[in-house]
Amino acid sequence: MAKQPTALIILDGFANRESEHGNAVKLANKPNFDRYYSKYPTTQIEASGLDVGLPEGQMGNSEVGHMNIGAGRVVYQSLTRINKSIEDGDFFENDVLNNAINHVKKNDSVLHVFGLLSDGGVHSHYKHLFALLDLAKKQGLEKVYVHAFLDGRDVDQKSALKYIEETEAKFKELGIGQFASVSGRYYAMDRDKRWDREEKAYNAIRNFGGTTFESAKAGVEANYDKDLTDEFVEPFIVQDQNEGVNDGDAVIFYNFRPDRAGQLSEIFTDKAFEGFKVEQINDLFYATFTKYNDNVNAEIVFEKVDLTNTIGEVAQDNGLKQLRIAETEKFPHVTYFMSGGRNEEFEGERRRLIDSPKVATYDLKPEMSAYEVKDALIEELNKGDLDLILLNFANPDMVGHSGMLEPTIKAIEAVDECLGEVVDKITEMGGHAIITADHGNSDMVLTDDDQPMTTHTTNPVPVIVTKDGVTLRETGRLGDLAPTLLDLLNVDQPEDMTGESLINH
């Protein structure tokens, strides 16, 4: 007899917001979501700031969200850990950072600093760059080159000049540091093996020829003149800088989120790299703020804190069969991040990865691969052996990042169609679903004055539990979702999971 599965369905980037203006969630025609919302118990939970282990007021993101969801507790994020280490001075005593600096001193070479130059707090924070500059100054370094990746996604689309000016003021204050190259994150921080993009950023960083400007500011302004926003600024070299990354140098990459920093780091450190032809660099000391992936051969500044008893491990320990399913853009989130930074499958776990469409930007294909994800899930459900399903629909977030309202509405409408088929199938099997999100985004695609808003929001996310006869607590946080799943599965919650089920007892 087929099992009665319990599913967690994450509508990525889908949050509650009262105002309809620029709110794709409110404006979309979503009969299935609305039907479940009126029929079943609902609540809303917090998905940002202190509730997910981030600094107060900091918007949540997919990595942080899935980690909190899977862990069933508040997980203190890299950003919070690094800020704390700077505040209490441990940062300046860090062995890996000091080893990088000593390597430069020994070789009379250059320290290169890579990273996303913004205060978005999703992948990086530029104040961490300032702390690195303080450390380099304290240690007497003279040559520090900054290779800046521009954001325009987790912050305003054209905000780079503000960060560039503040960084140049820091260079001036300390008497060290200069911009060496600048690339939009579209090039330097790809995660889908689009090596043609990464190669352009790599060539600028190595100073292998290409567009040159006399200053970072001039280069950004020239890109603005071509109607390019920060994310899409074409990699360029800053004139003063004429050395690039060379033998005997050191690199510190200060992004703390792994998924968009791994590919560039592989190019510099993986001797087996085959994406395009690279010139090996001898005696390069390469350090990354966190572990990016197994192909990156680097020293780690902040080692991972191990999370035990995540939802996947508890399911395994109780002999349950689980499925993780998403398209490429969110597959690491339902696997690696939801398992607390673990790549290996648990016993009884299987995975379905559906390729994301190969388009330049997802507003060109708002449905992305939602229908294929839905079809694959129905196929898996028909096997009748699943206890637990962890599913992510990427569209509201990925299309929401375009800052375009109509495509984002279409994205949500496509997901709603898929949601209906999936939830109805689970219900028909006698199972239950929790429909929720990991953070906001599509709830505010336009600002009040109709400018594109490409960032996440700090709004609470909805929760629907498709089970009759229960009521839900009035509030909670993402870390309460795993305990709620275990509650539906009639599985005891381990002590490590300090979240609380949203179901009233």
UniProtKB/Swiss-Prot annotation:
Keyword entries, A-Z: Glycolysis, Isomerase, Manganese, Metal-binding
Binding site for Mn(2+) 1: D397, H401, H456
Catalytic activity, reaction form: (2R)-2-phosphoglycerate = (2R)-3-phosphoglycerate
Family: Belongs to the BPG-independent phosphoglycerate mutase family.
Positions annotated to bind Mn(2+) 2: D12, S62, D438, H439
Pathway(s): Carbohydrate degradation; glycolysis; pyruvate from D-glyceraldehyde 3-phosphate: step 3/5
GO molecular function: manganese ion binding; phosphoglycerate mutase activity
Function: Catalyzes the interconversion of 2-phosphoglycerate and 3-phosphoglycerate.
Active site residues per record: S62 (phosphoserine intermediate)
Protein name: 2,3-bisphosphoglycerate-independent phosphoglycerate mutase
BP terms from Gene Ontology: glucose catabolic process; glycolytic process
Gene responsible for this protein: gpmI
The species this protein was found in: Staphylococcus saprophyticus subsp. saprophyticus (strain ATCC 15305 / DSM 20229 / NCIMB 8711 / NCTC 7292 / S-41)
